[in-house]
Amino acid sequence: MSFPAGIMWRVRRTVVLLHGFTHTGRSWDPVVARLGERYRALAPDIRGHGAAAEARPVSPAECAADVAAAAPESFVLAGYSMGGRLALHVALSHPGRVEALVLVAATPGLADPVEREARAREDAALAEQIEASTIEEFAERWGRNPLFKGQPTEVADAAHADRLRNTTAGLAAALRGLGQGACEPLWGRLGELRMPVVLVVGELPVPRVALAERMAAAIPHADVLVVPATGHAVHLEAPGIVAEAIVQAASAREPAC
């Protein structure tokens, strides 16, 4: 195929967006709206959530395989919180396919086995509470989590509406299979990441900033973006900034035309 002189053909990039616990792919809509026409967004529902609420088993390996099967041969990858942890699994399992990685309020897990075991017990108890609740009851309780304190009303309302797209059985299964207590930590493998990585974190949960900086020190090509006046759910509170971070990360690895 030939083009007139002076006309450049641009490849439309694919961005895969992985949501957090209790959310669905719809939670990324504000970011997708700001990515622009050069990007094709895929925001799947992770096992245990939304349209995939009944998919079993729920494990990092199975969920990573789902992402790899749905995505094109090469893609930009972003994930929030639990979805960020899953994004790490995908990037480490398919390093040649992930062009750039953006992690929003995400960590590689709990390195301390004692802390991880304690978290597993907490998650097991919470999973039982979720199963004993209606989705409306649990969504209301989860929205009061201190992690989300100070969210603008419109952001909190949108997050609540998204949680109602889930089922309690699905969320309980997701917590048991994808919670920090259930997953092996990936701290020791961060050095394997060779693609450009951007770690996005809100400035308000100060421990998260320190964790992001610690992660960046272990990743060969990583930058930390601290977003002022935002909390844990940065992509909901500042979707324009997160979209720009994705664009910048993607630009660092432009495909050949």
Please identify what each model-predicted range represents.
Residues 230-239:
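Catalytic histidine-centered segment of alpha/beta-hydrolase-like enzymes
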Residues 20-23, 81:
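Active-site glycine-rich loops that stabilize anionic/oxyanionic intermediates
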Residues 164-217:
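Conserved serine/cysteine hydrolase catalytic core
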